[in-house]
Swiss-Prot record:
This is DNA ligase 1. Its cofactor is Mg(2+); Mn(2+). The gene is ligA1. Zn(2+) binds at C411, C414, C429, C434. Its EC number is 6.5.1.2. DNA ligase that catalyzes the formation of phosphodiester linkages between 5'-phosphoryl and 3'-hydroxyl groups in double-stranded DNA using NAD as a coenzyme and as the energy source for the reaction. It is essential for DNA replication and repair of damaged DNA. NAD(+) binds at D35, F36, E37, Y38, D39, S84, L85, E119, R142, E177, K293, K317. GO terms for molecular function: DNA binding; DNA ligase (NAD+) activity; metal ion binding. The keyword NAD applies. InterPro entries: BRCT_dom, BRCT_dom_sf, DisA/LigA_HHH, DNA_ligase, DNAligase_adenylation, DNAligase_N, Hlx-hairpin-Hlx_DNA-bd_motif, NA-bd_OB-fold. Keywords: DNA damage, DNA repair, DNA replication, Ligase, Magnesium, Manganese, Metal-binding, NAD, Plasmid, Zinc. It comes from Deinococcus deserti (strain DSM 17065 / CIP 109153 / LMG 22923 / VCD115). It catalyses: NAD(+) + (deoxyribonucleotide)n-3'-hydroxyl + 5'-phospho-(deoxyribonucleotide)m = (deoxyribonucleotide)n+m + AMP + beta-nicotinamide D-nucleotide. The active site is at K121 (n6-amp-lysine intermediate). PANTHER family: CHROMOSOME TRANSMISSION FIDELITY FACTOR 18, DNA LIGASE.
């Protein structure tokens, strides 16, 4: 559509475009154009309707939308972290969880029968409500557990969330799940289908798409609901058990679950789970399991946490649904390491609320083990409730004349020979210049969680590789603005090609230049070595000052680092000594890449050799204290033993204080800890 079209034609085009982009955000939670392009479309539509009132209508997007529903929400740090849960998938694993609770409390397994509160695990969006002196200050999504996004305006129309709690003093965090009920989801999609609008994929996507935008009216139209079930900070709240928390929330006017139950022992918890599994089809909302929590709050505190989850709670997942469908084709994807991964292209089938059309087949051995043929009817489930996976073949429905699938001997992208080494499970493209490997490797290198090079998106990377300007990430550092400015960024509002332009090209070159001094863990992770994610990269970067130091480390050196292990260490050493990797590292160095040492190396090891346990209520959150101690070389444990150097104890310290007294472990309050930090030359608590 051009600007020279008639006003009526232009109005029709603008109306269609704005409505399309609204749908992509509201229904799909997936905007496809930048904010400024969207704003330009809306602005032009409004101006056109102002000049031609006859075009305006109550249903026009110009009359019904406000500002662009932005994905850039204000970030907020949760006063206490929102942790994940470990999973159980059988009664035996639930019994094992019961044993682990006992061990976390320094008790022999089976020596005590614990009381648990059992609740349904709702498949929605986690929310944290923060109150000060009884007044709601903000609501935020879970985010990464430490930092979430404020969505306060969007939750205010959801029933069961009071904005004031009379008589309450201090800080309070109330946590729960925002969801869309099955009935609301079905009604929404029925209406959307009648109106020719895209359907929601599942209730959770419907809730997420409504909650994460800045038009509260749209949220209200979605009919979201909430169930609250937990407290973070809880100044002045008179509760001693998880069951007390649920009753207190209900008394304050919060929406709570009618399906919660307090039980005695893990067998009773398993019976609750079996009952909920049977009721699952009749539940008014999607749920993917039950949550079993140690009821006594003091025992929860004593049991403590692992690095990612509480030791006193577990999510017992419902059995995965299994569906039958047909493998219509098997395609091959080449990854950034060159590995060829087979994918089953399935006849679309509904599975656990979503349509499944693809499933990974892992490798050649997996296909051979199932004796898969194209055209086979197969049984499919979601592994862990998330990843579609082929379980087996329905042999009686195999088409006559079908033959076993032959795994390719050449890369589907570049045509180069693909090799499977003896003893290896994977088949790999051997072409170092394979475009698929180059593109994915550079995209991985530039991604936010690795080198964090802003502005280097998928489309630009593909063009740089296709043009021969970039073969691997080291080539990025030779790019100039002149080489980048004429590449494509996307389409204009009129359907033309939008180029990068000189200004954006210069910004990108500056971003690439700035990445030369990224933290060591980022540069190390960017190498794409087997099993080296953020956690492993961070742990190793805390020990060594440079990439060269890591290259000189032996398998034994690396294996001694906590949570690295020998298998990972062997993979790292082998990868770093590979001839191609050595040449690549030399090119990075020649390009001027000089990683900044990670924080632990720079500050030294003032607390090295000391083991701390932190318990009780302190003015500084316990997780902040633990992180601070760990940054300066200390080991932080969840239980008191003879090897504990110090117990940091606040109010209501509980059984850990008793254990420390029994074992004659030194006990420090906050003032004592600050004094110790000063004596050791470490900075004070933040």
């Amino acid at each position: 559509m051009t600007q020279s079209s008639t006003p009526a034609e232009r109005h029709a085009w603008l109306t269609q475009k704005v409505a399309e982009h609204n749908r992509r955000y509201y229904e799909e939670d997936a905007p496809t154009i930048p904010d400024f392009e969207y704003d330009a479309l809306v602005r032009e539509l409004r101006e056109l309707e102002a000049r031609h009132p006859e075009f305006a209508a109550p249903t026009s997007p110009a009359q019904t939308v406000g500002g662009r529903p932005s994905t850039l929400f204000e970030k907020v740090r949760h006063p206490t972290p929102m942790t994940s849960l470990d999973n159980a998938f059988s009664d035996a694993e639930l019994a094992h969880f019961d044993d682990k609770v006992a061990r976390a409390l320094n008790l022999p397994p089976g020596s005590r029968t614990f009381t648990y509160t059992c609740e349904l695990k709702i498949d929605g969006l986690s929310i944290n409500l923060y109150y000060v002196d009884g007044i709601l200050q903000w609501a935020a999504t879970r985010g990464d557990g430490e930092v979430g996004e404020k969505v306060t305006a969007n939750i205010e129309g959801i029933p069961g969330i009071p904005t004031q709690l009379p008589g309450l003093q201090g800080e309070l965090e109330v946590r729960g799940e925002v969801y869309m009920s099955k009935a609301t989801f079905l009604a929404y999609n029925l209406k959307a289908e009648e109106e020719g609008r895209p359907l929601l994929k599942n209730p959770r996507n419907g809730a997420a798409g409504a909650l994460r935008q800045k038009d509260p009216a749209e949220t209200r139209r979605r009919g979201l609901e909430v169930i609250l079930y937990a407290l973070g900070k809880r100044d002045g709240v008179p509760v001693r058990t998880q069951w007390d928390i649920l009753e207190w929330l209900r008394a304050q006017g919060f929406a709570t679950s009618e399906y919660a139950r307090r039980v005695t022992g893990s067998e009773a918890a398993a019976a609750y789970h079996a009952e909920m599994t049977a009721q699952r089809p009749q539940l008014p909302f999607d749920a993917d399991g039950s949550v079993v929590k140690l009821d006594d709050l003091r025992l929860q505190e004593d049991a403590g946490y692992t690095s990612r989850a509480p030791k006193w709670a577990v999510a017992y997942k419902f059995p995965a649904d299994v569906a039958q469908t047909v493998i219509e084709a098997i395609t091959i994807q080449t990854g950034r390491t060159g590995k060829l991964t087979p994918v089953a292209e399935l006849r679309p089938v509904l599975l656990e609320g979503t349509t499944v059309a693809r499933a990974t087949l892992h490798n050649e051995d997996f296909i051979r083990g199932l004796d898969l043929h194209v055209g086979d009817t197969v049984r499919v489930h979601k592994s862990g409730g998330i990843i579609p996976e082929v379980l087996g073949v329905v042999l009686e429905q195999r088409p006559e004349g079908s033959t076993p699938y032959a795994f390719p001997t050449h890369c589907p992208v570049c045509g180069h020979e693909a090799v499977r080494h003896e003893g290896a499970a994977g088949t790999f493209c051997t072409n170092p210049a394979c475009p698929a490997k180059s593109t994915l490797r550079v995209r991985y290198f530039a991604s936010r969680d690795v080198m964090d090079i802003k502005g280097l998106g998928e489309r630009l990377v593909e063009q740089l590789v296709d043009a021969g300007l970039v073969r691997d990430p080291a080539d990025l550092y030779a790019l100039t603005a002149e080489q980048i400015e004429h590449l494509e960024m996307g389409e204009t509002t009129t359907g033309g090609v939008r180029r990068v332009g000189r200004k954006n090209a210069e910004k990108l070159v500056a971003e690439i230049e700035a990445s030369k001094t990224r933290e060591l863990w980022r540069v190390f992770r960017s190498l794409g070595l087997p099993y080296v994610g953020e956690g492993t990269a961070t742990r190793i970067a805390r020990v060594y000052r440079s990439l060269e130091d890591i290259r000189q480390a032996s398998v034994d050196d690396l294996a001694r680092i906590p949570d690295v292990g020998r298998q990972v260490a062997e993979g790292i050493v082998q990868g770093l000594r590979d001839a191609d990797m050595c040449a690549y590292l030399d090119r990075l160095t020649a390009a001027g890449v000089q990683p900044t040492p990670s924080v632990d190396v720079r500050v030294g090891e003032q607390l090295a050799g000391l083991t701390f346990v932190v318990t009780g209520t302190l003015s500084v959150p316990r997780d902040v204290i633990k992180l601070h101690l760990g940054q300066y070389g200390a080991r932080v444990s969840g239980s008191v033993t003879k090897k504990t150097s110090y117990l940091i104890a606040g109010e209501d310290a509980g059984s850990k204080l008793e254990k420390a007294t029994e074992l004659k472990v030194p006990v420090l309050d906050e003032a004592g800890l600050q004094k110790l930090l000063a004596e050791k030359g470490a900075p004070p608590l933040p």
